């Protein structure tokens, strides 16, 4: 086991300093958009923003949940901004994005959990940037009747919802969520709109056992999930859940090999893998792998 008191060399990244990084930062600030890159203190922000790739966080910057792994602010959220979908579409245009990733905080205070706001954002982008592919990373819409239908009908190219961790750790790491609700959400999106690629991710290093990770893989395939991401959990602050283990690159390769035997179209498993890391390139690979599988049937 790697010493958890300091981050190993394979986790360290260079500080962002490119002109493209600052251009992206300024544009996001000027359009008054939130990003999960900043709010969740993502280690890949320098690389992604230098490539003009940012994951926009809609529905405000305050979450109604308090997951032990997440750095996003929690509390009473702001009122919905009706102009946010238009500003988001403007940012996509100005950044000339081929692929955009949209995520959000949890909004348990809203009747549909924010599903219709996601749909409005998708529609605005489709109108102004019809060639841009759209990936959404949503909350679980727990006890929000009709939300899954709204999302499925909005037809994103990729629907992502993260299970985050193994079921045995939900009470301590993700107490406001339900593992089987997350699986059901993923399964129902695929059932309602089979043409949408589905994706889910989890963190390791929180104390889970290998056999539990493998069971999550099986559960996700049972839900017809196409793409699995696995990355190292990093503690945002001392008040968050502790890192129990730094999983080595070799162990990540082992997990990737196992996952590939399960039938996923795509697997990304590295210490720095995050849900939207290299999402644009991965979407192209996802389509290629789908076409290869289709041709072999």
From Swiss-Prot:
Keyword list, A-Z: 4Fe-4S, Cytoplasm, Iron, Iron-sulfur, Metal-binding, S-adenosyl-L-methionine, Transferase
GO cellular component, one term: cytoplasm
CDD domains from the UniProt entry: Radical_SAM (cd01335)
Record flagged with keyword Chloroplast: no
Disulfide bonds, paired cysteine numbers: none
EC number(s) from the headed UniProt entry: 2.8.1.8
Keyword Iron attributed: yes
Radical SAM core domain sequence ranges: 49-265
Primary residence: cytoplasm
Cofactor(s) named in the record: [4Fe-4S] cluster
Root EC class: transferase
Gene3D superfamilies, per the entry: Aldolase class I
A GO MF term: lipoate synthase activity
Pathway recorded for this protein: Protein modification; protein lipoylation via endogenous pathway; protein N(6)-(lipoyl)lysine from octanoyl-[acyl-carrier-protein]: step 2/2
Classification via Pfam families: LIAS_N (PF16881), Radical_SAM (PF04055)
UniProt-annotated binding residues for [4Fe-4S] cluster 2: 63, 67, 70
Cofactor binding, per record: Binds 2 [4Fe-4S] clusters per subunit. One cluster is coordinated with 3 cysteines and an exchangeable S-adenosyl-L-methionine.
Positions with a binding annotation for [4Fe-4S] cluster 1: 37, 42, 48, 276
Family: Belongs to the radical SAM superfamily. Lipoyl synthase family.
Name the record gives this protein: Lipoyl synthase
Species annotation: Rickettsia typhi (strain ATCC VR-144 / Wilmington)
The organism's taxonomic lineage, starting at the top: Bacteria, Pseudomonadati, Pseudomonadota, Alphaproteobacteria, Rickettsiales
């Amino acid at each position: 086991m790697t010493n958890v008191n300091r981050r190993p060399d394979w986790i360290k990244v260079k500080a962002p300093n490119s002109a493209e990084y600052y251009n992206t930062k300024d544009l996001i600030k000027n359009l008054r958009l939130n990003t999960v890159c900043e709010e969740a203190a993502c280690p890949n922000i320098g690389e992604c923003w230098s490539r003009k790739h940012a994951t926009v966080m809609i529905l405000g910057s305050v979450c109604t949940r308090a997951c032990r792994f997440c750095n996003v602010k929690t509390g009473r959220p702001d009122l919905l901004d009706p102009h946010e979908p238009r500003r988001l579409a403007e940012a996509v245009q100005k950044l000339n994005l081929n692929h955009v990733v949209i995520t959000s905080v949890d909004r348990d205070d809203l009747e549909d959990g924010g599903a219709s706001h996601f749909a409005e954002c998708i529609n605005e982008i489709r109108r102004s940037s019809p060639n841009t592919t759209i990936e959404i990373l949503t909350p679980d819409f727990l006890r929000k009747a009709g939300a899954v239908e709204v999302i499925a009908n909005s037809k994103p190219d990729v629907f992502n919802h993260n299970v985050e961790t193994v079921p045995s750790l939900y009470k301590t790491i993700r107490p406001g969520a339900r593992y089987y609700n997350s699986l059901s959400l993923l399964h129902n999106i695929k059932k309602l709109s089979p043409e949408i690629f589905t994706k889910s991710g989890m963190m390791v290093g929180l104390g889970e056992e290998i056999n539990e990770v493998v069971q999550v893989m099986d559960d996700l395939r049972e839900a017809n999930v196409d793409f699995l991401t696995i990355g190292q959990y990093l503690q945002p602050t001392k008040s968050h859940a502790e890192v129990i283990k730094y999983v080595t690159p070799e162990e990540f390769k082992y997990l990737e090999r196992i996952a590939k035997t399960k039938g996923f179209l795509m697997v990304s498993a590295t210490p720095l893998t995050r849900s939207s890391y290299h999402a644009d390139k991965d979407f192209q690979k996802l389509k290629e792998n789908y076409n290869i599988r289709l041709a072999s049937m």
